[in-house]
Amino acid sequence: MRKTSLLNSNISSVISKMGHTDMLAIGDCGLPIPKETERIDLALIKGVPGFIETLKAILEELQVEEVLIAKETEKVSPELFTEIKEIIKDTKITFISHEELKKELKDCKAVVRTGEQTPYANIILKSGVVF
């Protein structure tokens, strides 16, 4: 059995195959996921699992050098945005429109769908290197 915190085999598999600058998205339950992008659907019921707890778990495993966030997030969901900033600390944030974020999903290795229902609870994580 794994010793690290992330137990989901699908997420672990995607992360283990990621190289520098590859992208992984985490989204709320309403985020449209392109057909060509792998969907890892964790959503059970409204709010479960939550976006923040999913983000924290993934960041335990994935080295991230940059995140892409919809610029609408800060205005529409300021509490969520503040939590994200606290979690990612000094990681570079690139703001793009929500429409641009949805277009970027086709280039992600996978999208992890949560049960989150907070507006704009979506993020794209760009993989860094550990050396």
From Swiss-Prot:
Gene name as annotated: rbsD
Pathway assigned in UniProt: Carbohydrate metabolism; D-ribose degradation; D-ribose 5-phosphate from beta-D-ribopyranose: step 1/2
Locations listed in the record: Cytoplasm
Catalysed reactions, as listed in the record: beta-D-ribopyranose = beta-D-ribofuranose
GO CC terms of this entry: cytosol
Pfam families assigned to the protein according to its UniProt record, in alphabetical order: RbsD_FucU (PF05025)
Taxonomic placement: Bacteria, Bacillati, Bacillota, Clostridia, Eubacteriales
The enzyme's E.C. designation: 5.4.99.62
Keywords: Carbohydrate metabolism, Cytoplasm, Isomerase
Stated role: Catalyzes the interconversion of beta-pyran and beta-furan forms of D-ribose.
Active site: 20 (proton donor)
One GO process term, biological-process aspect: D-ribose catabolic process
Protein name: D-ribose pyranase
A molecular-function term among this protein's GO annotations: D-ribose pyranase activity
Species whose genome carries this gene: Clostridium perfringens (strain ATCC 13124 / DSM 756 / JCM 1290 / NCIMB 6125 / NCTC 8237 / Type A)
Subunit structure: Homodecamer.
Gene3D superfamilies: RbsD-like domain
Family the UniProt entry places it in: Belongs to the RbsD / FucU family. RbsD subfamily.
InterPro entries membership: D-ribose_pyranase, RbsD-like_sf, RbsD_FucU
SUPFAM superfamilies tied to this protein: RbsD-like
Binding-site list for substrate: 28, 98, 120-122
Taxonomy, superkingdom: Bacteria
